[in-house]
Structure formats: structure tokens, C-alpha cells
Amino acid sequence: YKTALNISKELNLRKEKRINQWKTIYDISTKNIVSILDDLDFYFDNYLGESDVILLIPDFIEFIKKENLAVLDDGALIANDGQDPPALITKSDGSYMYLTTDIGTILYREKNFKADKYIYVVDERQKNHFNQLFKLVEFFDLSQSEFLHIGFGTVNDKNGNPLKTRDGENYKLLQLFTDIQKQLSEINSDEKTVKMLSKSVLTYSDLVTKRTGNYVFDLEKFTNTSGKSAIFIQYSQVRAKRLLEQSNINYQFLTVSG
């Protein structure tokens, strides 16, 4: 634990050895993430992390100290806005908090994007963190834009616990996608169809439940060919389309009433 803290501090201080190690890990991780998202047909215009904003933080810290917007308490820097619990900006050893780097991302976005609204799509359990962050945005006068936290629930197993693999490890997205494909391959051998349906299963399982609530990911249930599942919906769509084609009616001009 202490070793990890020291490494984190050295990264914040831009120590060359740690930066080089980090770059290697960063490049491998980013390529892997992009590859997985590409398989799922998800794309982003920008892939930015804490490292892209870290250099903006020292000047910000000096500014809030100078303006008496933050005070030192046993070496730690705390926002002087009266929040309870207090908003910790840096630890006593000078290392940054999640709040610190989140503020850095806001500084970066205000400089480069200047959006009217910033939406954070993050686990509902981070609600208090974002409430505190948004109060600091106003207190430090970082932006006049609107800030929203769109929280979502956790994906659980049949027992209501966070979804894990059989070995008790965190269920990685790629592993989940692979397991869905294996399940669907038992009823359809066409690789292209299986991949398409697997994406539908993942998407539908998220959309069919209340966004802020936790839900149970039941592999057999969500890959079922009947009932409330993505596969059944797509099957129904194909059947309906086939009936329309056989009717010889130009359905583009049909109207829906009632």
C-alpha cells in the first residue's frame, strides 16, 4: 500500500522513471480498450485521462492558496468553502485526490471544449463525490456551464452480489461478451449473426432496467429466444417485416391511428 502511494506521488511529481513506466502501461491499456470498444461498435472522438490534465493542476493549486480559497490543515489542502465533510484537494504528502484530477479535467475542457453542459455518466455510488465536485466548480468559479451526474446501478449476479466470474474475479466486459457468444453459438452457428445478437443482448440488458437501479445479469434469461429479451424483439421485427413483404402493400405510406 505504501509503495503504491509513493509511486502515485512520484507520478504527480513527474518523475522520469515512473512516467516512462506509466507510458508503457498506458499505451497497452488504451489500445486494448479501443480494440474492445471497436468490437462492440462503440467509438469516441477523444480518449483522455488524468495524464492529459495533470499539468494544469499545480497552477490551480497556487491560485486557490493565493486567493485564500483553500487552507492547509496538518499539511493537507482543504477547500475553504465550508463543506461537510471537507473537500480535500491534496493530501499532506502533496499527492492528488480524485477531486483534484476531476477539477483538472474541468480546467482542460473549459480551455478546449467550452461546452454548455457537462454530463458525467458514472456509477450511482459516486453521487456524493460529484455533489462535492460541482459545489467546488461554483466556489472556485471554474465554469458557468451546467454540470450533471447521470448515475447508473451496478450489474449483479443471481444472488444480488456484484457480478463476478466463476473464479471470483471481476467480470471484464470482453469476458462477458465472449460468454454471451458461447451461449448463443449453441442455437446459431453463424458467427456474424452471433456477434450481432451478442451486442443486442448487452445493450438490451442495460436498457430494459431502471437506469439508477441495480440489476441481475442472468445469461440464460437475456439470451432466451422467447419472452422479454433482445433476441425475441429482433425475431419479432424480422417476422413483422416478412409479413409486410408478403402482403405486397407499400407500407411506407401506412398510417398508425388509435
Which residues does each PLM region occupy?
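NTP-dependent nucleotidyl-transfer catalytic core
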Residues: 1-258
